[in-house]
Amino acid sequence: MFIMRLFSSTSLILLLSFGSLLADQIYISPDKNIQERFQETLILAKPGDEIILAAGIYEFTDGLSLDVDDIKLSGAGHDKTILSFTNQITGAQGLLVTSDNVILKDFAIEDTKGDAIKVKGSNGIYFINIRTEWTGGPKSTNGAYGLYPVESKNVLIDGCIAIGASDAGIYVGQSENIIVRNSRAEYNVAGIEIENSNNADVYNNLTTHNTGGILIFDLPDLPKQGGHTIRVFDNQSIQNDTPNFAPEGNIVGEVPRGTGIIVMASENVEIFNNEIGNNATVNLAVVAGEDSDDPNYQKFPKRIQIHNNQFGPVGFDPDERGALGPILVEIASENIPDIMWDGILPFWQYLLGQPADEKLVIDSNGDATFINLDAFWYVVLPYFHQPETDIDVFSGNISPLPAVQLVFPD
């Protein structure tokens, strides 16, 4: 038995070593045949290969796809290696990745017809120093998403830039074990969006000049629901002032211009040590999701902790878009506060009270102001409506959430 185990272990080591010896470095430079040559390289690559893109502008007319595990695709820098899709005719995105343990590093994708980089069903996807951009500025005809991992695990987005997406610059959906850090999102409808996902850390990012800076959403009618355990910390969500340019019918089309952070229908979210200010409508909002026929959808946010944030000017030019804007302006009038909760609860909780472990906790945010819109009673009994503005009512002990653990690439 010992000999068999030794033989098996030795065979595995030799196999891994042999596999690494077979791995290639494949060098690509731009030329007139780059569409066919690059796609062929992506198809024929072997696990362990590194595809290295030289500096230059690569022009494509069709989308690209990668379905090989353990691949590193790297350029010379997001300002030097540029994959341009300005003349794209076909393809739903610039690059589609459907494999595991893929590193995308040091290049840019510009002006795709649809999403810039979509990743689906990957376990181990690492975006490092990637830029996605629609260079013509904010337009509803821009692609929806810049960086777009969905239905994936172990997602790292580090040092990236996302500009001009008509939905979200950086979007992670229906995924788990996520880190978004050291990145910049600007001139998108949503800068960073974590949707229907769990175990996410969003930190040390700058979201500015978007319609809304950071969105933590849970939506109905999706295979994965119940987004939870998300930390948003050490970010700047400032001066988000771009008018909403989402195509009609998109959920983010409801986001008012000038929103810092929104949490909708998620649970176990901790927001701390952020700088949130110069947002014309609201700095931080916690709201329920919309009614849905989906029996699995839980639309009420739970266990949201907001602490140790620094707030700046707010509400100086509110946008009355969607369901949030008009009611906020009408109730708060000219005194729009830093933190807004719509106050919507399951009906039985209005009668019996909210469980302690589901309550909103707001603590140690300096001179931050607050309003509970108490929107249900505003609609049902408007003449007796009394919004709550005492922030101390929501103070309490903070229960820190655990850090996300990923295995990082070399």
Describe every region a protein language model picked out.
Residues I3-L14:
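Sec-dependent signal peptide recognition
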Residues F18-G19:
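N-terminal signal peptide c-region/cleavage motif recognized by signal peptidases
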Residues D24-E36, E50, D70-G114, G136:
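Right-handed parallel beta-helix/beta-spiral solenoid domain characteristic of secreted/periplasmic
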Residues Q35-Q39, T61, F85-L95, D111-K118, ...:
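Extracellular beta-strand/beta-solenoid scaffold signature
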Residues E36-L44, E59-V68, L73, S84, ...:
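Short, T/G/N/S-enriched strand-turn elements that build extracellular solenoid repeat scaffolds
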